[in-house]
């Protein structure tokens, strides 16, 4: 598939990009970092921190719901917003539904909690992401409804038959 690069302007110029690993001064291979550290980065250096923190939460919900266990620090990144002099969460990329894996994140939710293993764990972490329980629950419902239409999207992309059956456990 040919995709439009999110780190380029319409006229081909570069938009500065760094991975979450770079932002946390990590080589990306260690497993000691947490999403709450990215919240801290956004609060400190973000151009629109609350919007991006809420978007990060949505992605954690999506990753959990599609069993994306490839959520390491090199698969999250930031683009520099020169107009607002700060970093923005980049568009999501490299999302991999994994039908045979446990629903467990590579990156920890908080420095104390460990990998994300359940809806309850995510919901308990919502305050770190500046979300009230009701807001977090509403986001969960919205993302779950979108994920529920995965078959329609997959068929539209040409998936059929056994491919749909094979991927179903990731979305169950």
Where are these regions (language model features)?
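Anionic ligand-binding catalytic core segments
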Residues: 1-73, 77-172
């Amino acid at each position: 598939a040919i995709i439009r690069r999110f780190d380029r302007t319409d006229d081909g110029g570069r938009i500065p990009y760094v991975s979450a690993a770079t932002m946390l001064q990590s080589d990306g291979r260690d497993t000691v970092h947490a999403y709450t550290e990215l919240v801290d980065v956004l609060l400190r250096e973000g151009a629109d921190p609350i919007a991006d923190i809420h978007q990060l939460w949505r992605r954690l919900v999506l990753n959990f719901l599609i069993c994306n266990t490839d959520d390491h620090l090199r698969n999250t990144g930031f683009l520099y917003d020169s107009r607002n002099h700060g970093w923005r969460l980049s568009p999501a990329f490299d999302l991999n539904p994994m039908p045979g894996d446990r629903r467990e994140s590579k990156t920890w939710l908080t420095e104390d909690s460990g990998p994300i293993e359940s809806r309850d764990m995510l919901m308990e972490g919502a305050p770190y992401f500046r979300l009230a329980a009701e807001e977090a629950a509403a986001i969960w419902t919205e993302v779950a409804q979108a994920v529920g239409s995965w078959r329609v999207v997959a068929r539209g992309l040409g998936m059929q038959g056994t491919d749909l059956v094979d991927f179903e456990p990731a979305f169950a």
